[in-house]
Amino acid sequence: MKSLILLTALSMPLFAASGALKTKATELSKAHQDSTLFISAVVTIELTAGSNPTQKEEKKVEVLGTVLNAEGLIVAPLSTIDLASSMDGRTVNTPQGPIKISAKSDVKEVKILMPDGTETDAKIALKDTDLDLVFLKPEKPASNFKPVPLADTAPMNLLDDIIVIGRMSKELNREPMAATGEIISVIKKPRLFGKISAPATGMPVFNDQGKFLGIGINRLTSKSSGENNVASTSVLLPAADIADSASQVK
């Protein structure tokens, strides 16, 4: 899935910011560079195809998440950390006939990688499989996180300029980054999503006025589609949906 997301990102047209958009992007980067943090975890995946023996694999992952409050509630795309969520319950066609896939993930050793290089132990607080969201929070009470303005939002409009605030990969020291682009499509069914011209998986997206629009998630093919391969496309999930789902966290 990572290679598909990277290929999609590289195929997007480049968008060079200038004038007021560049100024606002620089301002947002300074204000919210610590609102996007990496989450690390060890994930054990168990996969069973029909009556075949169960296959088990363990891997360490690092995924980007967006900070929602000062207490450290973080949201990230579920499909990037619970690697079985996109496969469980799917039916694949084989020469021997359709086979149903059963998959589950055990996510452990969850840590929030803080801007100063320290690690904070964390846990999964809620999974929203419909929206591809997972909410995480520190194991111990905290109040030192830098959240995005979850209540200061705006609707998505076609061809609106956008600003993405994120971080580079481990290989590039997880340095803060900012990118600009535009909303190239607004998808209204089966629910509202935006398609933007910049990669934003797990990252907060703002408009040119600094209003919070949402975060990038992965939109997967339906489990009832009958397709053998799990196709994924990165989309912008509106802030209102994130806030509604976050309100269920206890």
What does each model-found stretch correspond to?
Residues A17-P77, E109, A240-K250:
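N-terminal activation segment of mature serine protease catalytic domains
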Residues N69-K127:
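Catalytic-histidine neighborhood of serine endopeptidases
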Residues E62, N69, A76-A84, G166, ...:
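Short beta->alpha transition motifs characteristic of CBS
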Residues M1-L7:
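Sec-dependent signal peptide recognition
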Residues T8-A17:
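Hydrophobic h-region of N-terminal signal peptides that target proteins for export
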Residues F206-K250:
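C-terminal subregion of chymotrypsin/trypsin-like serine protease catalytic domains
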Residues I39, G65, G72, A76, ...:
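Terminal peptide-recognition signature
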Residues K24, F145-A200, G216-N228:
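Flexible, gly/ser-rich surface segments that form the specificity/activation loops bordering the active-site cleft
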